[in-house]
């Protein structure tokens, strides 16, 4: 299952393993910076589809990306054949929600942190719209927060840095 519970936290983290393709590498043998954005996009699409498969068709808003921020921490190991992307909902607003992703190499080392703001849209008008109560309920079931912070009334973004790629048997 692509969703995993994280001990001591509410919500769930979505995990997706992606193969590295020849086209992901630049002429220097490094994974090109644009490939990280593709990994992020592929994982977000899978994340939304998985949420919808659990909660039902039409339960997740149609979205456009409003903002993307990538923090490249280190290059992906040249020996890596796959990357793992851990995705979590971090906040929910009136028309948008935040997703935080960690891209890990095959050794489980965090190589990039991605923060995305996605806006719910009316596809007919391509205009932002409010997240419905039922969509909000689905998104809230995915939001991850440390239980201790919730008990203290804090709402900081959780730290999923310690998640490792799932076993290949999952």
What label would you give each PLM region?
Residues 1-84, 90-98, 102-170:
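Terminal targeting signals and extreme-terminal segments of soluble enzymes
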């Amino acid at each position: 299952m692509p969703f995993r519970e994280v001990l001591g936290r509410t919500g769930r983290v979505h995990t997706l393993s992606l193969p590295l393709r020849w086209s992901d590498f630049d002429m220097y043998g490094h994974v090109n910076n644009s490939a990280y954005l593709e990994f992020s996009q592929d994982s977000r699409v899978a994340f939304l589809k998985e949420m919808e498969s659990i909660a039902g068709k039409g339960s997740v808003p149609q979205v456009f990306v409003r903002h993307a921020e990538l923090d490249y921490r280190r290059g992906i190991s040249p020996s890596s054949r796959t990357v793992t992307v851990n995705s979590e909902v971090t906040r929910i607003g009136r028309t948008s929600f935040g997703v935080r992703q960690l891209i890990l190499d095959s050794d489980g080392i965090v190589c990039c942190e991605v923060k995305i703001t996605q806006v719910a849209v009316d596809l007919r008008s391509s205009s932002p719209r409010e997240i419905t109560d039922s969509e909000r309920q689905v998104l809230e079931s995915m939001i991850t927060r440390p239980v201790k912070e919730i008990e203290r009334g804090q709402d900081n973004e959780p730290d999923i840095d310690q998640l490792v790629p799932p076993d290949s048997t999952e």
